[in-house]
Amino acid sequence: MIRCFHVTKRYGAITALTDISFQIDEGEFVFLTGQSGAGKTTLLRLLYRAELPTSGQLIVAGRNLATMPRRQVPRFRRRLGLVFQDFKLIEDRTVFDNVALVGLAVGFSFTESQRRASELLRLVDVDGRAQLFPAQVSGGEQQRVSIARALMTAPKLLLADEPTGNLDPERANEIMRIFHAINQSGTTVLVATHDADLIGTVGRRALTLEAGRLNTLAVASQVS
């Protein structure tokens, strides 16, 4: 699903990533760990083609990102699910609309968009909040909505950048268990986090970045 070959990313004189190589197979659940500033967000931005590496090769979902024409990037991103720390919900639209509008944007019919939005809000257990606005629900519920939105196109790969950074430990563990369920359904999941305590909640391997270098490959403990 993801193959990264000797990727380096520089911003002028600053090197954000140095000689990164790894592989994530289809159906895996992998954590990307490291302290703030280690390069996690930079690597994720490369994976969803928000930026290009300075050198090296990235193959994601069978596509070479370095050679992908710019006009094909939106279609490529529809094959991905993206979840962010700050939710990125539309504040003046309801919870339901925040999910359903994605379907309309990618070409689903109105009926299909409504159906999938209802199913996904049930999946993440916020269907009872569907007609509220983002400001009227908790941070944990907003993150659940953002996950439902990310799943609207039935992505094969889900990328999450510090998805629990604004949540308390209990809500964070709930979000991790949702990701686990998504992975169990066949979706490849990559979660970037600086919170080492989260890794044991799902029990998967972890790629660890330190100062822009991939230093270790760890195996997280299994959930009891």
Which residues make up each language-model segment?
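Helix-to-loop junction immediately C-terminal to a conserved catalytic motif
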Residues: Y48
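Conserved ABC transporter NBD signature motif
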Residues: G56-N64
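ABC ATPase NBD coupling module
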Residues: L65-G81, F110, I182-Q184
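Short coil-to-helix segment of the ABC ATPase nucleotide-binding domain corresponding to the Q-loop/switch region
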Residues: R93-V102
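Conserved signature/switch motifs of ABC ATPase nucleotide-binding domains
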Residues: L132-A135, T153, S185
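Conserved ABC ATPase signature
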Residues: F133-V137, E141-Q143
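Catalytic Walker B motif of ABC-type/P-loop ATPase nucleotide-binding domains
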Residues: L158-D161
